[in-house]
Amino acid sequence: MENAHTKTVEEVLGHFGVNESTGLSLEQVKKLKERWGSNELPAEEGKTLLELVIEQFEDLLVRILLLAACISFVLAWFEEGEETITAFVEPFVILLILVANAIVGVWQERNAENAIEALKEYEPEMGKVYRQDRKSVQRIKAKDIVPGDIVEIAVGDKVPADIRLTSIKSTTLRVDQSILTGESVSVIKHTDPVPDPRAVNQDKKNMLFSGTNIAAGKAMGVVVATGVNTEIGKIRDEMVATEQERTPLQQKLDEFGEQLSKVISLICIAVWIINIGHFNDPVHGGSWIRGAIYYFKIAVALAVAAIPEGLPAVITTCLALGTRRMAKKNAIVRSLPSVETLGCTSVICSDKTGTLTTNQMSVCRMFILDRVEGDTCSLNEFTITGSTYAPIGEVHKDDKPVNCHQYDGLVELATICALCNDSALDYNEAKGVYEKVGEATETALTCLVEKMNVFDTELKGLSKIERANACNSVIKQLMKKEFTLEFSRDRKSMSVYCTPNKPSRTSMSKMFVKGAPEGVIDRCTHIRVGSTKVPMTSGVKQKIMSVIREWGSGSDTLRCLALATHDNPLRREEMHLEDSANFIKYETNLTFVGCVGMLDPPRIEVASSVKLCRQAGIRVIMITGDNKGTAVAICRRIGIFGQDEDVTSKAFTGREFDELNPSAQRDACLNARCFARVEPSHKSKIVEFLQSFDEITAMTGDGVNDAPALKKAEIGIAMGSGTAVAKTASEMVLADDNFSTIVAAVEEGRAIYNNMKQFIRYLISSNVGEVVCIFLTAALGFPEALIPVQLLWVNLVTDGLPATALGFNPPDLDIMNKPPRNPKEPLISGWLFFRYLAIGCYVGAATVGAAAWWFIAADGGPRVSFYQLSHFLQCKEDNPDFEGVDCAIFESPYPMTMALSVLVTIEMCNALNSLSENQSLLRMPPWENIWLVGSICLSMSLHFLILYVEPLPLIFQITPLNVTQWLMVLKISLPVILMDETLKFVARNYLEPGKECVQPATKSCSFSACTDGISWPFVLLIMPLVIWVYSTDTNFSDMFWS
C-alpha cells in the first residue's frame, strides 16, 4: 500500500478489508500470498565459480601472459636435447602465477557478494498475528505474513514487515530504528496520520519498519508491505543494482596493460621481420621453417621479458603491507585496491553521530535562578567540562571551578537528574571505557550528577566500577522512586513520584519532572530561588525562555531540558494511572528549578583533521539524519563552515534537495558541505553526482540504510560499531569510529601510491632493459644473452624483493599539503616514460655489452672479432671468416652469466635510485629504508645461490664467475646511478620547481650551502669502492679498440 502513513487507521483497514480484532480470513491470506509472495528477501543468485574464474582472465595483461605460456609450452614440447626439461620451467611458472592471481581474485569477488546475504540477519523468524481461524493471537513464521495481516508487537520483538500502527496498548511505544534511519535514540511512535506524502522515514511516526526493534511498549498494526516491497527490501534492490566500479589503480593498470601489449606486439613482429634474412642460415639446417620457428621463440622470449610478471605480486604485497600499517591506526581495510584509492580521495562524506561527534551525549551548560525581583531576574549560569560518559569533569562559573553543594538550586537539580532517570553508567573493563546503560539523554544527566557531587561524597579509593554511579547512589538512598509517569507526546515530559527513605515532618513526597522547556515551563507557577520558591511572572518566564532559545539556536544548538518539582503532589491513591491522558493533570502547579543544555560533542581531534583535509584539497561533507540546525552548528564547531559563514547554498535538508531541479541538485553537490535530514536514497544520489564530477568519494555509514551508498562510493567506510551489512558492503572499517582515522588512512594511501610509482618505475625500467637486450642481440646477430627461464627468475625473484621493499619508503613530509592527484592522470607521465626509456636502454646495452666483453676482450674468453660475433650463425669449419674459432664457444655459459649478473647488479643499483623519485642518493642514503638494503642483500645472495650451488647453474645455464669478471660487472653496472642522478637533478631544478629551495641566480652558492643535507657517511663509504673498481684493469677498453 502506497503512502499508508498519510491514511487514517480506518482507511488502511478498509483498503485491506480487515478487522483489527479478527484479522484476515484464510481465503484472503491465500490470495494475498499468491499476489505478493513470501515475506522474505530473495537469495541473491551469485556468479558460479567457473564464471568467476573466467572473469579473472579478462585482464589484458593476464591474457598476454597466458598466450605466452601456451606458446612456450608448445615450443617446449618440440624441444630436443638437454634443454627439454628447462624449457618447461617457463610456461609452468607463468601458469602458476596466473592460477595464484585467479584464486585471489575469486576470493575477493566472493567476499563482495556477502553484503547482500548479510541483510537476511535482519529478517525475524517468527511473527504474532490475528487471523479469523483462531480467536487469540498466533505465532507463525515471519515469511508467511502477508499485507493486511494484523500483527501484535511488544518490547524485544523484531518488526516482521512494514506496519502501519493501528493502536498502542502501552503508555508509549519506543522503537530502535537506527539500523534503517541512523537515528541514535529510540523513536516514540503514535497512530495519527502523517499528512505529508513525501515524509522521510524518520518522520513517519505511525509506521514500523521491517528489521527494526521494539525498545519499549506494546502495539498492534496492519502490515502494508512485505518482502522486497519493504524499506529494507528496497535497500536490497539498490545494492543488487549497484555495480562495483573499478578502482583508479585497476583502471591505470588496465590502460598500462593495453599500452604494453601494443608495444610488445610491435617489438615482437619487428624482431621477427628483422631476422627474416637469417631464416635460411646453415645453423638451422638450411630450413626456412626451422629458422622462422627459432626467431619466433626469440619473439616469445621478448614477450616474457617485456611483461612484468612480478608486478601483480609486488602490488598485492605493497597493498597488504599498507593494510597492516592502517590496521595499527584503527583502519581495517577489506579490499586491497581501495588502499591506493584512498590516496586520491577528493571528497569525504561523513556521518555526524559517532564519527565527527563522540555519540556520547553530555551536558555542557546549565542554569538556576540567582534572584528574582518582580519581572526581572538574574541567572547563575554554569559550564561543565568533559565530553564523554566518563564521570570526570568540573562545573565552572565565570571560568572558575565551583563546589555545587554551595548552591541549593544545584542540589535540587542534581536530585531531579538522578531520580527522574532510568539510565546508569557502566565501566567496561575489557575496553577500559565508561559506557551508557539506557537512553543517551538520561545517561548524560547521570554523568552530570557524578561531576556535580552535590553531597561531597568521598570518591578517592573507589574502583572505576564503584565510581561509575557513586554520587547517584547517594541521592537514591535519600529518596525512593515509587512510580513513573511515562513520557507522552501531548505533554512532552515525564515525571517520577518519590518518597523519602526516612520520613519526617519536613520531608514529604515529591514529584520530579523533566521535559521539553516549552511544555514544562507552561505548567510552572513558581520558581526555585535558593531554598525558597517565588511566583513566576510573565517577565521572568520570558527571560528564561529567551535564554533557552539562545542555547537551542546558537553556535552549540543545545538540546535543552527543563527540570521542575511538584512540592505537594496528590497521594498515589488519588491518582488514576491507568489512563495516560490524566498524567498532565498531575504535572501542574510545578516549581521551575533549572535547565540543562546538552549535545553530542564533536570529537576533540576532528577539528584539526578537517583543517588537514582542507590543506590537502579534500572537501569534507557532513551527511546526517539529524536536523539542519544541529548539523550546521556542529559543522561550524569543527571547521567545515566558518563561524560567520553564510550557509544558504551550502547546507540542505533532504526535502530541500529533492525540491531542486536536476541542474540545481548538481550545483548543490558541487558546493554543499552539509546535508541534513537525509534518507538512504539521498546518499546514493549525492555519490552519483560527485562521481559525475570525477570526484573520488569516501562515504561513511553504519546502518543497513547506508549499505547502497557504501557500495556505490569508491571508498565505503563502515563503523566498527556498525551493522554487518554496512561492514560487508564497505572497503574499510573504522575500528574506533573516528573521522581522524579516515584522514590518517588517506595520508597512508597517498604514501602508498608514491611508493607504488617508484616500484612500478623500477620494475618497468628493468623490463625495458630486458627488451632492449633481446632486441639488440637479435638486431646485431649476437648469440642469446638471456634465456626465458633467466628472465623469469629476474622478474619474479631478484627484482621482486627490492620492489616490495620500496613499499616501505618513508612518506614525503609535505604529502598532505598537496591537492589530491587527478585519478585520470597517467601512471607514467611523459617525463617518467623518458626516464624509464633512458635507464632501460642503458640496462639493455650494458647487459649485451657484458656478454660481448667476454667474447671480445676477456682474458679467459675466445677474443673473437665483432664481425665474427655478429655473424656467429655462419660459423663452420670450412668458413675462412672463422678460421681458428671453435664454433662451440658461441654456446658457452659465460657470456650469459655475465649478462645475467650485470642485469641483476644494475637492477640493485636501480633499486637505490628508486628510494626517492627526485631526491639525490647523497641526501637520501640507502639506510633511509633499511628494508631495501636488506632486500638487495637477499637478492644478491639468491643470485650467488644460482651461480655457485649445484645443480642450479645447470638449470639456469650459467657458470661461476671469477673476481676479474665480477669487477667488470660492477664497472658496467655503477654508471646507472650517475645517469639517474643527472635525470633527478634535471627534474628537481628545471621540471618541478618548488620542490627544493633554489638559490637566487644573483647569489653565489657557497660550499656549505651546496653541500647542505649531504650524507657524508654514504660518500665516505661509496668513494673507495668506486675508485677501486675503476682503477682495476679488466681489458674494458680493448672491447672498443680491438
Curated annotation (Swiss-Prot):
Has different conformational states with differential Ca2+ affinity. The E1 conformational state (active form) shows high Ca(2+) affinity, while the E2 state exhibits low Ca(2+) affinity. Binding of ATP allosterically increases its affinity for subsequent binding of Ca2+. Reversibly inhibited by phospholamban (PLN) at low calcium concentrations. PLN inhibits ATP2A2 Ca(2+) affinity by disrupting its allosteric activation by ATP. Inhibited by sarcolipin (SLN) and myoregulin (MRLN). The inhibition is blocked by VMP1. Residues 787-807, 931-942 are annotated as: Interaction with PLN. The modification 3'-nitrotyrosine is found at residues 294-295. Residues 575-594 are annotated as: Interaction with HAX1. This is Sarcoplasmic/endoplasmic reticulum calcium ATPase 2. The modification Phosphoserine is found at residues 38, 531, 580, 663. It is linked to Acrokeratosis verruciformis: A localized disorder of keratinization, which is inherited as an autosomal dominant trait. Its onset is early in life with multiple flat-topped, flesh-colored papules on the hands and feet, punctate keratoses on the palms and soles, with varying degrees of nail involvement. The histopathology shows a distinctive pattern of epidermal features with hyperkeratosis, hypergranulosis and acanthosis together with papillomatosis. These changes are frequently associated with circumscribed elevations of the epidermis that are said to resemble church spires. Its EC number is 7.2.2.10. GO terms for cellular component: calcium ion-transporting ATPase complex; endoplasmic reticulum; endoplasmic reticulum membrane; longitudinal sarcoplasmic reticulum; membrane; plasma membrane; platelet dense tubular network membrane; ribbon synapse. The chain crosses the membrane at residues 49-69, 90-110, 254-273, 296-313, 757-776, 787-807, 828-850, 897-916, 930-948, 964-984. It is a multi-pass membrane protein. Changing residue 602 to L: In AKV; no effect on protein abundance; loss of calcium ion transmembrane transport. It comes from the Eukaryota. One of its GO terms (molecular function) is P-type calcium transporter activity involved in regulation of cardiac muscle cell membrane potential. Mg(2+) binds at residues 351, 353, 702. It catalyses: Ca(2+)(in) + ATP + H2O = Ca(2+)(out) + ADP + phosphate + H(+). This magnesium-dependent enzyme catalyzes the hydrolysis of ATP coupled with the translocation of calcium from the cytosol to the sarcoplasmic reticulum lumen. Involved in autophagy in response to starvation. Upon interaction with VMP1 and activation, controls ER-isolation membrane contacts for autophagosome formation. Also modulates ER contacts with lipid droplets, mitochondria and endosomes. In coordination with FLVCR2 mediates heme-stimulated switching from mitochondrial ATP synthesis to thermogenesis. Residues 70-89, 274-295, 777-786, 851-896, 949-963 are lumenal. ATP binds at residues 353, 442, 489, 514, 559, 624-626, 677, 683, 705. It comes from Homo sapiens. Interacts with sarcolipin (SLN); the interaction inhibits ATP2A2 Ca(2+) affinity. Interacts with phospholamban (PLN); the interaction inhibits ATP2A2 Ca(2+) affinity. Interacts with myoregulin (MRLN). Interacts with ARLN and ERLN; the interactions inhibit ATP2A2 Ca(2+) affinity. Interacts with STRIT1/DWORF; the interaction results in activation of ATP2A2. Interacts with the monomeric forms of SLN, PLN, ARLN, ERLN and STRI1/DWORF. Interacts with HAX1. Interacts with S100A8 and S100A9. Interacts with SLC35G1 and STIM1. Interacts with TMEM203. Interacts with TMEM64 and PDIA3. Disulfide bonds join 875-887. The active site is at residue 351. The keyword Zinc does not apply. The modification Phosphothreonine is found at residue 441. It holds the Pfam family E1-E2_ATPase. Isoform 1 is widely expressed in smooth muscle and nonmuscle tissues such as in adult skin epidermis, with highest expression in liver, pancreas and lung, and intermediate expression in brain, kidney and placenta. Also expressed at lower levels in heart and skeletal muscle. Isoforms 2 and 3 are highly expressed in the heart and slow twitch skeletal muscle. Expression of isoform 3 is predominantly restricted to cardiomyocytes and in close proximity to the sarcolemma. Both isoforms are mildly expressed in lung, kidney, liver, pancreas and placenta.
